[in-house]
Design a protein with these regions (language model features):
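Acidic-basic catalytic patches of nuclease active cores, encompassing PD-(D/E)XK
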Residues: 1-31
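Surface-exposed cleft-lining segments at the edges of enzyme active sites
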Residues: 2-3, 52-56
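Short glycine/proline-enriched coil/turn segments at helix->beta-strand junctions
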Residues: 22-25, 41-44, 74-77
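Beta-rich catalytic cores
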Residues: 35
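Conserved catalytic cores of phosphodiester-cleaving nucleases, focusing on short active-site segments
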Residues: 39-54
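Short, charged, amphipathic alpha-helix that recurs within catalytic cores of restriction-modification
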Residues: 57-80
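Intrinsically disordered, low-complexity terminal regions enriched in charged/polar residues
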Residues: 89-130
Length: 130
């Protein structure tokens, strides 16, 4: 399951790269697989989370606290993109928006072992359709 999830995510990164460059600039590059974010340039960090559900299936969508902390600590403009089955949505990450997120322990159990961590749960109404 883990390998399938990685392949699913990498495919979405490749499929959406042109669209992301057209929105955020031609200098955007795709980062290495072990990087904390999926795309960047000198001034911006972009993380893409691909989901297997529609936008409104759940009231929130989650992302690891570590990713958000990394983005905030970078001093760069930081964007999270959520690729739902029915559309691509975005949110710009800044300290003011974090107050609207809920931080709690979460994770998944469907890949053979528990994967638990601290996650921010972002209310979907804060996301903008692209």
């Amino acid at each position: 399951m883990y390998k399938k999830d990685l392949e699913f995510g990498f495919k979405a990164e490749d499929d959406l790269f042109g669209k992301i460059k057209s929105i955020y600039g031609e200098k955007i590059i795709k980062t290495e697989p072990n990087c904390r974010v999926d795309y960047c340039d000198d001034n911006i960090l972009i993380e893409l989370k691909s989901r297997r559900n529609n936008y409104n299936t759940y009231p929130t969508t989650m992302i690891s606290k570590g990713k958000i902390d990394y983005m905030l600590d970078s001093g760069k403009r930081s964007i999270c993109l959520f690729n739902f089955t029915d559309g691509l949505y975005s949110i710009e990450i800044d300290k003011n928006k974090i107050d609207k997120f809920k931080l709690k322990k979460g994770g998944r159990f469907d890949r053979g072992r528990p994967e638990l961590n601290q996650y921010y749960y972002i209310p979907i109404e804060l996301l903008t359709k692209m």
